[in-house]
Swiss-Prot record:
<dbReference type="InterPro" id="IPR050088">
    <property type="entry name" value="IspD/TarI_cytidylyltransf_bact"/>
</dbReference>
<dbReference type="InterPro" id="IPR018294">
    <property type="entry name" value="ISPD_synthase_CS"/>
</dbReference>
<dbReference type="GO" id="GO:0050518">
    <property type="term" value="F:2-C-methyl-D-erythritol 4-phosphate cytidylyltransferase activity"/>
</dbReference>
<dbReference type="InterPro" id="IPR029044">
    <property type="entry name" value="Nucleotide-diphossugar_trans"/>
</dbReference>
<feature type="site" description="Positions MEP for the nucleophilic attack">
    <location>
        <position position="215"/>
    </location>
</feature>
<protein>
    <recommendedName>
        <fullName>2-C-methyl-D-erythritol 4-phosphate cytidylyltransferase</fullName>
        <ecNumber>2.7.7.60</ecNumber>
    </recommendedName>
</protein>
<feature type="site" description="Transition state stabilizer">
    <location>
        <position position="17"/>
    </location>
</feature>
<keyword id="KW-0548">Nucleotidyltransferase</keyword>
<keyword id="KW-0414">Isoprene biosynthesis</keyword>
<comment type="similarity">
    <text>Belongs to the IspD/TarI cytidylyltransferase family. IspD subfamily.</text>
</comment>
<dbReference type="InterPro" id="IPR034683">
    <property type="entry name" value="IspD/TarI"/>
</dbReference>
<dbReference type="GO" id="GO:0019288">
    <property type="term" value="P:isopentenyl diphosphate biosynthetic process, methylerythritol 4-phosphate pathway"/>
</dbReference>
<dbReference type="Pfam" id="PF01128">
    <property type="entry name" value="IspD"/>
</dbReference>
<comment type="function">
    <text>Catalyzes the formation of 4-diphosphocytidyl-2-C-methyl-D-erythritol from CTP and 2-C-methyl-D-erythritol 4-phosphate (MEP).</text>
</comment>
<dbReference type="InterPro" id="IPR001228">
    <property type="entry name" value="IspD"/>
</dbReference>
<feature type="site" description="Positions MEP for the nucleophilic attack">
    <location>
        <position position="159"/>
    </location>
</feature>
<feature type="site" description="Transition state stabilizer">
    <location>
        <position position="24"/>
    </location>
</feature>
Length: 236
């Protein structure tokens, strides 16, 4: 039987670094909620059996009317960390018929520059891979190491072989769930899915990402994201 595709959007964060009381995924960019762009990109890919958005149990800001016409489901099962939210979402996917052998693409709600073309590039590159992988970009900037709380440069780090992880990150549901569970049991709170897969002893692959697909984090990022989203992505 052919493995199916599911998308999982952890959306339980408060966006404390964004400088706004409103969680960043609900802020308006170029006329739409930031989250809308992610949902629209996955909605445009008919290959997906379901897209699941995981929000906090006490989220008072989510309004389904802002995303009318898009195909997705919502579950209020967000946890105290991204890792916990993803784990809870993976468990919820069984409700939609997902099996351990199916693929899940986990994507940050705060990366509105994702495109259907990039999603399909990732799927095409990894659909026959035994592990899976992520979209990422080679590090372009020179890297400096500075001690915590300080401002003096200790040394310059080599950027050779370094890639900046993005999302989506694509893995088999069973493998990812087991990897996160193992990390949790060992007291590790990892910041992305690939880290959990690596922790479990597997080797994910990288697929070339896009500068457009950056993560909106700080207040100044909103202006940049709005400028990008105001112009349609070029077809690849």
């Amino acid at each position: 039987m052919t493995s199916r595709l599911f998308a999982l959007i952890p959306c339980a964060g408060t966006g404390s670094r964004s400088g706004s009381a409103l969680p960043k995924q609900y802020r308006t960019l170029a006329g739409r909620a930031l989250l809308h762009y992610t949902l629209a990109a996955f909605d445009a890919c008919s290959e997906f059996a379901q897209t699941l958005v995981v929000i906090s149990p006490d989220d008072a800001h989510f309004d389904a009317r802002r995303f009318a016409g898009l195909r997705f489901a919502v579950r209020r099962c967000g946890g105290a960390s991204r890792q916990a939210s993803v784990m809870n979402g993976l468990i919820q996917l069984a409700e939609f018929g997902a099996t351990d052998a199916d693929w899940v693409l986990v994507h940050d709600a705060a990366r509105p520059g994702i495109t259907p073309a990039l999603i399909r590039t990732l799927i095409g590159a990894l659909k026959d891979d035994p592990v899976g992988g992520i979209v990422a970009l080679p590090v372009a900037d020179t890297l400096k190491r500075v001690p915590a709380g300080g401002d003096a440069i200790e040394r310059t780090e080599s950027r050779n072989g370094l890639w900046q992880a993005q999302t989506p990150q694509m893995f088999r549901i069973g493998m990812l769930r087991d990897a996160i569970q193992r990390a949790q049991l060992e007291g590790r709170d990892l910041t992305d899915e690939a880290s959990a897969i690596e922790w479990a002893g597997h080797t994910p692959r990288v697929v070339q990402g896009s500068l457009r697909n950056f993560k909106v984090t700080y207040p100044e990022d909103f202006d940049l994201a709005e400028a990008i989203l105001a112009h349609p992505a070029r077809a690849s």
